[in-house]
Each structure stands twice: as C-alpha cells, then as structure tokens.
C-alpha cells in the first residue's frame, strides 16, 4: 500500500486529484511546504489504520508533521515516505466499485464520520460510522466520476498490465471544479461496507465469485 504510488499513478494518467509531491527527504519536503501557494495536508505513504493524514492549521504545523513522520518515526515504516499535497475544499464521499478488468459495478455512494470531535472537529479517526446512499453524490457528480476518474483509472491499470479484479475504493472530494481523488484502496471501506452490504440485492458471494473468474455481469 502506497499513497506515493497512487499519486504517481494519478498524475501519469491525468486523473483529477490535488496538486502535490512525494518526499523521503525532510529538507526537500520543508522547502516544498514553505513555497506552496496553498494550504497543505501531510500523508504517510503507507498504511496507518486510517490515521496517517495530518491536516495542519498552518505551515508551521505542516513542517512539524512532516518532521514527525520522516525524522521522528511516526507511523514507522509507513511514514518513511510522505505525500505533501494541496488541501482540497469540498465534501468527501466514498465510491466502491466491483471491478473485473474494464467492467465494473458502482455501489451506492457513501460517507463516513471521520473527525473525533463534535461538529466534525478534531483529529481524523479510521471512521466512526457511515451512511448510504450519500445525497451529496448527485447524478451529475457520479457522471463526472465515471467519465473523469473511473474511465482513466481502469485504462491506466490496463496500460500497466494489471488485470484488476476485486473491490476498488475511490475516496473523492467534491470540489467546485469537479470530483477529485483523495485516495484509492483495494478493499471495501471500513465502516462504509457495513451500510453497503444490505443495499446489494444480488448475491454478494456469487458476485465476487464471478469477478474472480472474470465474468462480471454489469447488469446485476
């Protein structure tokens, strides 16, 4: 699992996402943070139980977060490489896809409750609850996601020689200029999966078995 790999993939295949760069060197990371013409977020590249993203209030906090990961050992090996990227304004949503090569089924959009404090404040958690369908993901938003995120992503996987079969979690930020990718996961969302499973009318096990065997019926 690597957010740095994901960022490079998104750039390579022109999938909308936040501006940003990957760093293993603290001096270069600090220079980027201080020169960035926008507020930034700091992400540990590896797995961190949904808690590896720091949303600083200012550049001083951003530099401190970068140092904690690259020099202080925060998140262990997962923090040895970081992603510094533009803080996007908008509302997040989770899009789960059942993918079989160039075919896919999109499950209802969902949202989870991340912040630990009342009124959506405080540090991020791994998710403390979820609901679906998410009203913020309108038809227009989902059409945008299909055309500008999913299509180039699946084309990119094919170009990389990856016959992807399974769940693809696309975390998006719905901004004024369209949906942008926050993250990819190759699993169901947690806790989003708990509210999505009851909404799947077909047999989930049969669906997953079909995908594993390369015969997804997109009309299911």
Stretches found by the model and what they are:
Residues 35, 68-71, 210:
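Residues within well-ordered alpha-helical secondary structure of globular protein domains
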Residues 23-24, 56:
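Conserved aromatic
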Residues 210-220:
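Peripheral (often C-terminal) accessory segments that flank ATP-dependent C-N-forming ligase machineries
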Residues 37-59, 196:
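Conserved anion/nucleotide-ligand pocket segment
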Residues 20-22, 95:
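Conserved beta3 strand of the protein kinase N-lobe
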Residues 199-212:
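C-terminal catalytic subdomain
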Residues 1-17, 24-35, 40-41:
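Conserved N-proximal alpha/beta basic substrate-recognition cap immediately N-terminal to
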Residues 52-193:
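Internal nucleotide-binding/catalytic subdomain
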């Amino acid at each position: 699992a690597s957010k740095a790999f994901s960022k490079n993939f998104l750039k390579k295949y022109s999938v909308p996402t936040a501006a940003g760069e990957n760093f293993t060197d603290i001096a270069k990371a600090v220079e980027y943070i201080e020169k960035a013409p926008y507020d930034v977020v700091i992400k540990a590249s590896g797995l961190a139980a949904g808690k590896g993203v720091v949303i600083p209030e200012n550049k001083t906090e951003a530099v401190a977060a970068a140092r904690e990961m690259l020099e202080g050992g925060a998140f262990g090996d997962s923090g040895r490489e970081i992603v510094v990227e533009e803080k996007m304004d908008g509302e997040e949503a989770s899009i789960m896809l059942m993918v079989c090569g160039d075919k896919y089924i999109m499950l209802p959009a969902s949202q989870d409750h991340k912040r630990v404090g009342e009124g959506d404040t405080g540090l991020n958690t791994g998710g403390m609850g979820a609901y679906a369908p998410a009203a913020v993901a309108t038809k227009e938003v989902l059409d945008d996601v299909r055309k500008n995120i999913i299509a180039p992503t699946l084309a990119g996987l094919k170009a990389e020689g990856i016959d992807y079969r399974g769940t693809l979690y696309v975390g998006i930020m719905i901004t004024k200029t369209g949906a942008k990718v926050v993250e990819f996961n190759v699993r169901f969302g947690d806790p989003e999966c708990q509210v999505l499973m009851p909404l799947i009318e077909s047999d989930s096990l049969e669906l997953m078995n079909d995908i594993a065997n390369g015969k997804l019926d997109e009309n299911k």
